[in-house]
């Protein structure tokens, strides 16, 4: 940057590595030049709303692009601004630094400006929710436009528009307004600090939308990879926004590959077929839709096994999707995480999660097609309310997705590891006593090693 540029902008630029700074500094001229070449009309010295729309139009709605423009305009660059000149070079650089490399304290004023306006000091949860709907929609569109779908096919998946609204409402529900419905800067700072997904959405939209490519930091990963799904024949309940919501909650996060194991739409309504598809297949996500449109499910952290005892561990959870998106983790009250039984006369036969016999948080009867969610006032295991529209529900659709590696793959990975890798203290002691580590450096590298 030149000597005449603001001290504030120069400090922000220092956050980027030397090899990244040309990409950041060149963004202004590139955006300005794109508009100049696309139109023979007179252009301002700064960036205009039209310039942003030309660049981001395929990844964000018109209202979201206006919000970004408001955020840019809200920045004090530390140098005089000329009214009518548009967004200055310094404002853009500070904006990029705060979104791509900033803290919750620096991002909070930008979120406030994008939700309420450049001069705002406070906003409402309703305004934040509207902003979030625009932002989540933009994230989904950006993933599709930039080819970051990781083998998912949105056109064969659940209602994406509904999912955007549900995820936006869920994220907004995490706000802790100081007043009944009022959010100030401190409230937004706390929210951004607690909800890392917010920063990822912003980073994805601004980095990809404005074409800022940073070698040291690829675009945020918001989706897990889809390892297998019969897309030609499939129309699933799972949606991209639901994947964005669920995958960070899993033990392996976004790295866990998903594969379809069972769907009533493809495999029919058969409890025996369900067992055959899911037993001993590793961790799974169950997704249930009842005949009244409610969508809910659960995550099982271990393979399903047929036995009269409860199974699983505290990593299991229940969740709701529609009419609201929420997660319900274990309370510690009991260990009734998972249950699967068949062919017993004295024990319940079916699949359940949480609660107790006859009063599960989620229950699918072996006589396929119906179940219950008897959790009034709350499920003892997960603290979840009634998940279905009615306590006893009829099943419309059931999907089961395997998440993570298969048990045999996990076992094979563990066998590959040297005992010295598993116990670094033993390795250190051998080196201290002069023992030669003959196998060191001789094993074939792992597939995922550089």
From Swiss-Prot:
GO terms for cellular component: cytoplasm; lysosomal membrane; membrane; nucleus. Residues 236-404 form the TLDc domain. It is found in: Membrane; Cytoplasm; Lysosome. SMART domains: TLDc (SM00584). Residues 430-450 are annotated as: Disordered. It comes from the Eukaryota. GO terms for biological process: positive regulation of protein localization to lysosome; regulation of cell migration; regulation of cell population proliferation; response to amino acid; response to insulin; response to nutrient levels; response to oxidative stress; TOR signaling. InterPro entries: TLDc_dom (IPR006571). Keywords: Cytoplasm, Lysosome, Membrane. Activates an alternative mTOR signaling to regulate cell proliferation and migration. This is MTOR-associated protein MEAK7. It comes from Danio rerio (Zebrafish).
């Amino acid at each position: 940057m030149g000597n005449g540029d603001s001290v504030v902008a120069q400090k922000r630029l220092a956050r980027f590595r030397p090899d990244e700074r040309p990409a950041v500094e060149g963004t202004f001229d590139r955006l300005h030049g794109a508009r100049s070449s696309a139109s023979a009309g007179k252009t301002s010295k700064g960036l205009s709303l039209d310039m942003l729309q030309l660049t981001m139009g395929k990844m964000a709605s018109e209202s979201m692009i206006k919000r970004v423009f408001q955020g840019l305009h809200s920045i004090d660059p530390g140098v005089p601004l000329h009214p009518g000149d548009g967004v200055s070079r310094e404002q853009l650089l500070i904006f990029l630094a705060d979104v791509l490399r900033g803290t919750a304290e620096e991002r909070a004023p930008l979120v406030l400006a994008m939700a309420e306006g450049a001069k705002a000091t406070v906003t409402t949860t309703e305004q934040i929710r509207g902003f979030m709907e625009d932002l989540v929609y933009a994230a989904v569109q950006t993933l599709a436009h930039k080819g970051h779908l990781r083998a998912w096919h949105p056109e064969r998946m659940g209602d994406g528009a509904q999912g955007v609204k549900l995820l936006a409402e869920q994220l907004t529900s995490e706000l802790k307004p100081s007043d009944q419905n009022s959010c100030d800067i401190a409230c937004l700072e706390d929210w951004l600090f607690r909800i890392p997904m917010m920063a990822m959405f912003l980073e994805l939209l601004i980095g990809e939308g404005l074409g800022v490519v940073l070698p040291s930091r690829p675009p945020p990963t918001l989706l897990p990879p889809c390892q297998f799904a019969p897309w030609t024949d499939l129309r699933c309940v799972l949606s991209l926004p639901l994947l964005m919501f669920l995958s960070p909650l899993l033990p392996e996060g976004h790295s866990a590959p998903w594969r379809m194991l069972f769907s009533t739409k493809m495999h029919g309504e058969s409890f025996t077929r369900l067992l055959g598809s899911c037993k001993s297949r590793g961790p799974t996500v169950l997704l249930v839709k009842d005949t009244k449109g409610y969508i809910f499910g659960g995550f099982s952290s271990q393979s399903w096994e047929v036995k009269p005892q409860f199974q699983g561990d505290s990593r299991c959870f229940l969740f709701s999707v529609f009419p609201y998106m929420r997660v319900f983790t274990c309370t510690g009250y009991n260990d009734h995480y998972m249950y699967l039984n068949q062919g017993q006369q004295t024990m319940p036969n079916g699949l359940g999660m949480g609660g107790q016999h006859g009063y599960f948080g989620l229950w699918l009867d072996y006589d396929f097609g119906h179940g219950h969610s008897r959790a009034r006032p709350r499920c003892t295991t997960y603290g979840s309310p009634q998940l279905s529209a009615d306590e006893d529900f009829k099943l419309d659709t059931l999907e089961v997705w395997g998440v993570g590696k298969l048990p045999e793959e996990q076992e094979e990975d563990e066998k590959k590891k040297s005992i010295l890798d598993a116990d670094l203290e033993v390795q250190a002691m051998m080196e201290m006593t002069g023992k030669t580590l003959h196998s060191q450096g001789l094993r074939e590298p792992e597939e995922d090693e550089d």
